Amino acid sequence: MAKRIVEPFRIKMVENIRIPSREEREVALKEAGYNPFLLPSSAVYIDLLTDSGTTRYDHHGSMITGDEAYAGSRNYYDLKDKVKEMFDYDYVIPAHQGRGAENMLFPVLLKVKQEQGGAKKPVFISNFHFDTTAAHVELNHCKAINIVTEKAYDSDTYDDWKGNFDIQKLKDNIAPEWCRKRCCHYFSITCNSAGGQPVSMANLKEVYEIAKHHNIFVVMDSARFCENAYFIKERDPKYKNATIKEIILDMYKYADALTMSAKKDPLLNIGGLVCIKNDEKIFTLARQRCVPMEGFVTYGGLAGRDMAAMVQGLEEGAGEEYLHYRIGQVKYLGDRLREGGISIQYPTGGHAVFVDCKKLVPHIPGDQFPAQAVINALYLESGVRAVEIGSFLLGRDPETGKQKHADMEFMRLTIARRVYTNDHMDYIADALIGLKDKFATLKGLDFEYEPPVLRHFTARLKPIK
């Protein structure tokens, strides 16, 4: 039976929300081109679009200490000290968010690989690149290759580490001419596109050792690093008695750099980081890109108060009691749905419940976006906005223009941090379970407008008659 986890906080301020009428929702969805990204937030009752930047703060005290100096803000040096404490990395560049961090680092990795005499057909290899990460790889004329464990594709079967790299695939074609193509191994922790699934410490270590043997740089996408550390504590007996911060330090031994959207686990509404362990050349080249792309090197597109909040958020996000509640709330929603006969990626991950829409609407083919059809039905039924992680998000192959094949067609129910109560989780579960009899009647979708890059953000769709 689904178990509620009590919230480890008191509510000090509230925001009133309302459920738009069915008629209002129908009009809003049509005007949005059947793409919930284009809905105004006023047309949404419970917003499960993303956990990025949607956290509720308790950082306001630290924000008052913001030093808004253009150069040399003391908040930058506080942030640098916190990064050293948590990750043991020497070099820090702030960014306005995660994609800003990627935009500074990825071209540098390509440049360095080219200087080494390789990268004629450069690739980034990941357990699973998320959408903006893959876009930055492809905008740099590189290929994004995903090799998550095959266990991730079996949504009904429990496995502790569905975010792991497939080690055998990583070792395939490891000959020198293939290694010269690899700009980096890129860990996504937790692995968002596979269902917010964790990566084991053993997998981190093995991937890193393979990379170092072949002179390949390793980067950690660190949006949800605290959640990954919590899963390691819960599931790896070696770390049962370790603190979350001790586990984090061990995790980051197995990378050379990190990019971070601080809008997730560090509990911010804005912010990102590039951190380099000890490679001064990579740091210098990335910092050169900071000034024209993000801002001066000690603020990187952020106000001093945002860096002050990041220092606090990095600490709070690693709190074990908070993580127990956070991941427990997601599990509660997942358990409610499974008890109601809704297929999900099992076990639930750290930040969202991923509903397996291939099983809910098997009559809708991938190129008609089955998860998007379920998302729109849920919105019309309840005012709940979710997001698609499947064919619609994956987009087209930049070389052939053909739709990329999606092994998973997920509706992601993403839980904002410290925003919704367990009663909201029950409302979501009841609404989706109540749709079960309507799934067979849902129709697929086609494009009215398709942008060339990251199409799912601004595309307009129409129901197929």
Swiss-Prot record:
The organism sits in which domain of life?
Bacteria
Keyword annotations for this protein, in alphabetical order, are:
Lyase, Pyridoxal phosphate, Tryptophan catabolism
How does this polypeptide assemble, per the annotation? Homotetramer.
Which HAMAP family would you find in this protein's record?
Tryptophanase
The entry's family comment says: Belongs to the beta-eliminating lyase family.
- Which gene carries the instructions for this protein? tnaA
What reaction(s) does this enzyme catalyze? L-tryptophan + H2O = indole + pyruvate + NH4(+)
Which PANTHER family would you find in this protein's record?
A: BETA-ELIMINATING LYASE-LIKE PROTEIN-RELATED, TRYPTOPHANASE
Q: Which Pfam families match?
A: Beta_elim_lyase (PF01212)
Q: Tell me the pathway.
A: Amino-acid degradation; L-tryptophan degradation via pyruvate pathway; indole and pyruvate from L-tryptophan: step 1/1
Question: What cofactor requirement does the entry state?
Answer: pyridoxal 5'-phosphate
Protein name (Swiss-Prot/TrEMBL)? Tryptophanase
Q: Please tell me which top-level EC class this enzyme sits in.
A: lyase
Source species, please?
Answer: Proteus inconstans
List the Gene3D superfamilies: Aspartate Aminotransferase, domain 1, Type I PLP-dependent aspartate aminotransferase-like (Major domain)
State a single Gene Ontology molecular function.
tryptophanase activity
Positions where N6-(pyridoxal phosphate)lysine occurs in the chain: K264
- Which EC number(s) are documented for this chain? 4.1.99.1
| InterPro entries xrefs | ArAA_b-elim_lyase/Thr_aldolase, Beta-eliminating_lyase, PyrdxlP-dep_Trfase, PyrdxlP-dep_Trfase_major, PyrdxlP-dep_Trfase_small, TNase, Tryptophanase_CS
| Matching SUPFAM superfamilies | PLP-dependent transferases
